[in-house]
Regions:
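Glycine-rich His-Gly loop
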Residues: 42, 106-110, 238, 282
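Primarily recognizes the serine-hydrolase "nucleophile elbow" in alpha/beta-hydrolase
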Residues: 213-272
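Domain-level recognition of soluble alpha/beta enzyme cores
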Residues: 1-104
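Alpha/beta-hydrolase-fold serine-hydrolase catalytic core, especially in secreted/extracellular enzymes
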Residues: 2-5, 10, 23, 252, ...
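Divalent metal-coordination and catalytic microenvironments
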Residues: 40, 124, 211, 232, ...
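Short substrate-entry loop that stabilizes the transition state in hydrolases
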Residues: 80-144, 266, 285-287
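The feature captures the conserved acid-bearing segment of alpha/beta-hydrolase catalytic domains
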Residues: 255-315
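Alpha/beta-hydrolase active-site loop
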Residues: 141-225
């Protein structure tokens, strides 16, 4: 856990957690109700944290979950003993009295965890946003609740991406090799998800409900720090990004969204997107992610990163050195460009302080804006 980026905004960052106890039956844990943990990152004055200790980055249970499910070698005991297990934020730091900030909802990817994209969330909070990262029990490598309990991922979940697995992988490979325009590729992906991805599709609606449970809590309990007037932004990595795309269809209070390298699973075929949306991709996954660029009334953007792999868009880029998982691109370059995409987009479509996001192609990213193509 040695290398981590520091936030660059005008604010320091506070953090705390909450758990929503719902009455929803949990399909992944029969006989149990689904409880939703969330972590809040929020702007605080830098002088208010001068004497505070930084929050822990990871618990031992989370390290066990990463190793157990994803085989990620996190030496928790060594990092903790050497003082390297910290996050660039402060537990329960004093809120800024009389100041409210717009809300961004973040959803992690399947078999990630609530703090798995914390570097991005912390940067956004330092730029004047409240960010709530939602945990998804049994879908994450480990999910921790405020009463001290925790659950690991559902057994065998890593084998349910495609059903049957062999046929799904074969057809996903055919999609990546297929040469077609954005609409043709989107239709090929729709065939793939309908024929082989029933489990993954079923999780989208549950994750939407998880997100709305977390939002309802925030509306009831955090209105002193959150400005709900401009609406709410949704974003996420992988399946969390697909959830953000569906939230933009389904929930009026969600006004814009960003998907980090997530294929657009969900019941979106033939629907018209009316919210501004940004799709971030690595080159290897772009052909599975073209749905965002068709059937939209609002601006749609594509940002494609060179030399990146899927897992590298999370904190893991700074923690492990497996190029096949995280890509060859320098971790700091990835983080800088990713954060710029987010701040430019949300400053435009959530804060409404800009006319248009200033996201330019460079030697790391290729940017395309798609004009609305639907009435």
């Amino acid at each position: 856990m040695t290398k981590r980026p520091s936030p660059t905004g005008e604010y320091a960052v506070g953090t705390f957690t909450y758990t929503v106890n719902t009455n929803r039956d949990d399909a992944l844990a029969p006989g149990h109700k689904r409880n939703i943990p969330a972590r809040v990152y929020y702007p605080v004055l830098k002088e208010s944290v001068a004497d505070l200790t930084m929050a822990k980055y990871m618990t031992e249970n989370m390290a066990i979950g990463l190793k157990k499910t994803m085989h990620v070698p996190v030496n928790f005991k060594k990092a903790d003993a050497e003082g390297d297990n910290f996050s660039e934020c402060y537990e329960n730091a004093p809120k800024i009295e009389g100041k409210k900030f717009p809300l961004i909802m973040f959803n992690h990817g399947l078999l990630s965890f609530r703090e798995g994209n914390s570097f991005l969330c912390i940067e956004l909070a330092s730029k004047g946003y409240v960010v709530i990262s939602v945990g998804h029990p049994y879908d994450a490598v480990c999910t921790e609740f405020d009463d001290g309990t925790y659950v690991f991922a559902m057994k065998g979940i890593q084998n349910k991406q495609y059903e049957p697995m062999l046929g799904g992988f074969f057809n996903a490979y055919k999609l990546i090799k297929y040469n077609g325009d954005n609409r043709e590729l989107a239709e090929k992906f729709e065939e793939l998800q309908q024929n082989y991805c029933a489990f993954v599709r079923s999780r989208i609606s549950e994750w939407e409900k998880d997100t709305m449970n977390a939002i309802d809590y925030a509306k009831e309990n955090l209105s002193d720090m959150i400005d709900f007037e401009p609406g709410i932004a949704a974003c996420g990595h992988s399946l969390g990004g697909a959830t953000a795309y569906m939230l933009c269809f389904d929930k009026p209070e969600i006004v814009c969204g960003i998907n980090i390298d997530g294929a657009p699973f969900g019941e979106n075929h033939g629907r018209i997107q009316e919210k501004p949306f940004l799709q971030i991709s690595c080159t290897g996954n772009l052909k599975a992610e073209t749905r965002v660029f068709i059937d939209h009334k609002a601006p749609a953007y594509s940002v494609v990163f060179r030399d990146m792999a899927h897992v590298g868009f999370s904190d893991m880029k700074h923690m492990i050195k497996f190029n096949s998982l995280t890509g060859k691109l320098d971790a700091d370059l990835m983080h800088e460009n990713l954060c710029n995409c987010f701040t430019e987009f949300f400053d435009t479509y959530l804060k409404n302080t800009k006319e248009k996001p200033d996201i330019q192609s460079n030697d790391v990213i290729t940017v395309t804006e798609y004009a609305p193509d639907a009435e």
